[in-house]
Amino acid sequence: MKKLKQKYKNVVKKIFDTFYGPIKDSVKKSKDIKIYKIKIEKKNYNIFEVKNCRIYTDTIHDTAFIWKNRIVEGPSFQLRNYINSSVKENVVFKKNTTRFLKKFNGNILSLLTGGGGNSNYFHWMFDVLPRIKIVQKKINLNTINFFLVPNLDFDFQKTTLKLLGIYKKSISSKKYRHILSDKAIGTSHPWQMTKSAEFDIEHLPKWISYWIRSKFIKLKSKKNFIRIFILIVQIQNQTCQIKEK
């Protein structure tokens, strides 16, 4: 059975190699790749702009920005044991982009993270949405035609995107796993700064919480009541759980 599955995978890869060509290697710099270096409260981040770029994701561990059949180092990620590994381990080298391509005219901002962004509230609020704040340091959001998000199935995802005014421009990576755009934009991870997921989650940048508060908590009455929202983060076997009170 295993041999049969492997043969099937090899056939699928050859088919997509024929359609889109094999992934050759990786690239850091090019005339079509711009990298902006910014700081938010002494934290360093990169913003990546790639012209005529494909984005492929398996929706869980790997996302590849692909320019001329090369993976762009920086915005691409390949999570192994919760840590972003070498770009050489990206799944597209082994399996290619095993989904048919969808073309979007215009600029796309990728808000993709690991599989946690698909359904986990914490990862949505702290991994996905803060990338908007990072990008705003250099790019006017009005110039972005589409926002590629992990998922759109849950109410909290729809609600937060509506409050940010970008819901109608949002597309789900669950539906569109392989896309092409005139320009693809990505960022560094908002809070994964080291090779220790446990350390990073215990030292979340304060600006993320302040940004979330400024965007989503509005006091309707200054006299009568205050709405309090508490996030309790627990580390259990390197898994982040969220409780609301």
Region annotations inferred by a language model:
Residues 1-245:
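The feature primarily captures lumenal catalytic ectodomains
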